[in-house]
Amino acid sequence: MVETLESIISFIVVFGALVFFHELGHLLLAKRAGILCREFAIGFGPKVFSFKKNETVYTIRLLPLGGFVRMAGEDPETIELKRGQVVGLLLDESGQVEKIVLNHKDDYPNIRVVEVEEADLEHGMYVTGYTDGERFERFTVKEPAFFVVDRQEIQIAPYHRQFAAKTLGQRTMTILAGPLANFLLSLVVFIIIGLLQGYPVDKPVIGELTPEGAARAAGLKQGDKVIAINGERMETWTEIVNTIRAHPGEPLQFQIERNGKERSVTVTPEAKTVQGETIGLIGVYQPMEKSVLGSIKQGLVETYYWTREIVTGLGQLITGQFQLDMLSGPVGIAVSTGKVAESGIYYLMKWGAILSINLGIVNLLPLPALDGGRLLFFAIEAVRGKPVDRQKEGMVHFIGFALLMLLMLVVTWNDIQKFFL
């Protein structure tokens, strides 16, 4: 029970952080482009916690399965004023409309009640209508202005503040920023690990020793420089490993340098069978170093390596070399995260960085409802010279989202069978 709880907490913290930075990428680029962002949400479903800062409501929702940035023009519930509709207008000192009250008008003693004749809240920013039943007036709507519905304020978004109004480049960068934020996060985490823990180097030096390994028993110490093994000169850590692995159970003569003096040590590798192959092991780890430039280089190497590995895995999945039941969903990832967390904070950080790369790559796939799907429609727009009809695009994304949810259910059921049944 305790282990299950720890797995759940580890998963929520790690996955929540990945989603946070992914959505933060979208948010920052959207705001930079001048898009009105109504909500920044981590999770789906009912709100657990929320606060508003400037134009945006920041929320944490119940189900930690993703997140979203709700941008103006992408709202499912757009408010429109219709002819004959009776609304209340709250005016500022200059006579411009600050708030359009749709109900509970009695809450406002200084309200101007208007029967709407015409309203343009995207371009012209005005409302015309009749006051006192017969007097026709035109009211200018200021920026920012708000609808008030059930005593809740909703900011009115002129067209120039909407997602669709922005250039193709601005929209592309806003969508691309999410996956890019995941790659950047992974790079930063790998660099931090290098700065705190160190990074492996391919030098002929003994690293940390295991308590009961053959190396410690023979008298080797951390920091010993290996000059030669059985008379063969060693230039790298890789050469040392290959030599030890190739001689299970056979005494090896190590020529080492310690404190400026050379000495000879005999070590007999323990024979161990791994995946059907018998290899030699002496219980030593690769040497580690710490430096800013080295950590940055290692971070770039790790980010590239895991990006390549994940892309290769996806290619094998598409070509049928991997089966669907080999995929892991939220349950499988949560279980794996819990196991990794038991190994220590650095292992958990590295696991989180790998998951972040995974999230970035998956979101770049040209599938409906994913960032890659949006980017595909932008590419079509660039070729055609005009955007795809919004309703048609929305339907494609809706169907794609439904299929993704179906896939999620299948993968989750596989996880439950694998780990709990």
From Swiss-Prot:
Residues holding Zn(2+): H22, H26
Cofactor: Zn(2+)
Residues spanning the signal sequence: none
Uppermost EC category: hydrolase
Subcellular location: Cell membrane
SUPFAM superfamilies: PDZ domain-like (SSF50156)
GO molecular function terms listed in the Swiss-Prot or TrEMBL record: metal ion binding; metalloendopeptidase activity
Keyword Lipoprotein: no
GO BP: proteolysis
Keywords: Cell membrane, Hydrolase, Membrane, Metal-binding, Metalloprotease, Protease, Transmembrane, Transmembrane helix, Zinc
Topology of this chain in the membrane: Multi-pass membrane protein
PDZ domain location: 186-271
Family (UniProt): Belongs to the peptidase M50B family.
PANTHER family cross-referenced by the UniProt entry: MEMBRANE METALLOPROTEASE ARASP2, CHLOROPLASTIC-RELATED, REGULATOR OF SIGMA-E PROTEASE RSEP
Function in brief: Is responsible for Site-2 cleavage of the RsiW anti-sigma factor. This results, after a third proteolytic step catalyzed by the ClpXP protease, in the release of SigW and the transcription activation of the genes under the control of the sigma-W factor.
Identification of the protein by name: Zinc metalloprotease RasP
Organism: Geobacillus kaustophilus (strain HTA426)
Taxonomic lineage: Bacteria, Bacillati, Bacillota, Bacilli, Bacillales
